[in-house]
Curated annotation (Swiss-Prot):
Protein family (similarity comment): Belongs to the small GTPase superfamily. Rab family.
Short sequence motif Effector region: positions: 37-45
Cellular component per GO, a single term: plasma membrane
SMART domains (UniProt xref): RAB, RAN, RAS, RHO
Biological process annotations from GO: protein transport
NCBIfam families according to UniProt: small_GTP
UniProt keyword list: Cell membrane, GTP-binding, Lipoprotein, Membrane, Nucleotide-binding, Prenylation, Protein transport, Transport
Name listed for the protein in its UniProt record: GTP-binding protein YPTC5
SUPFAM superfamilies referenced in this protein's UniProt entry, alphabetically: P-loop containing nucleoside triphosphate hydrolases (SSF52540)
Cellular localization per UniProt: Cell membrane
Topology of the protein relative to the lipid bilayer: Lipid-anchor
Function: Protein transport. Probably involved in vesicular traffic.
Length: 206
């Protein structure tokens, strides 16, 4: 009886300070939420073992500091990433406007071979805040930005109320696995002559 190979996926979470990156990570991995998180210094990560589409996966989720003074640490943390999650607070327009900077910073620091097809994900967090009355970024506006960047999958989330957190990270995992498989098609030492290569396309939502 053969043993399934376990894949290690490195996921980077980026966004301004205070948008809920640490809360999302902890809600997904540990199923808990607290308001007492201290600001992340540098970077931290948690791991979670899951099975998606009959594949065993170890998720290594990196939560990086949102402060500009820590962006210079990026190259060491971003390299080898299989997926990048961009997070903004729907109640903070500036955090949404800064997504362009975070995406560009990741591409510069991580240097993915095919940036246009690298699996990004965008999460609009804190949709529960004040019953939605303090919202500054509409779902329509967020989806339009994602569409302009190559149809990046978008989820609206609440780390506090555990809304869409599991679904978002499951989609993240699938897109990262799909990207990993497609990249293998371009690696001479990884070509399986018995496998028919499927047409490459932008990873969508699950």
């Amino acid at each position: 009886m053969s043993t399934k190979k376990r894949r290690l996926l490195k996921v980077i979470i980026l966004g301004d300070s205070g948008v809920g990156k640490t809360s999302l990570m902890n809600q997904y991995v540990q199923k808990k939420f607290t308001k007492e998180y201290k600001a992340t210094i540098g970077a931290d990560f948690l791991t979670k073992e899951i099975e998606v589409d009959d594949k065993k996966v170890t998720m290594q989720i990196w939560d990086t500091a949102g402060q500009e003074r820590f962006q210079s640490l990026g190259s060491a943390f971003y390299r080898g990433a299989d997926c990048c999650v961009l997070v903004f607070d729907v109640n903070n327009a500036k955090s949404f406007d800064d997504l362009d900077n975070w995406r560009d910073e990741f591409i510069i620091q991580a240097g993915p071979p095919d940036p246009d097809n690298f699996p990004f994900m965008v999460l609009g967090n804190k949709i529960d805040e004040n019953g939605g009355s303090s919202r500054q970024v509409s779902e329509k506006k967020a989806k339009a930005w994602c569409a302009s960047k190559g149809s990046i999958p978008y989820f609206e989330t609440s780390a506090k109320e555990d809304i869409n957190v599991e679904a978002a990270f499951t989609c993240i995992t699938r897109n990262a696995l799909r990207n990993e498989k497609e990249e293998e098609l371009f690696m001479p030492d990884a070509v399986d002559m018995n496998t028919t290569a499927t047409q490459r396309k932008r990873a969508g939502c699950c």
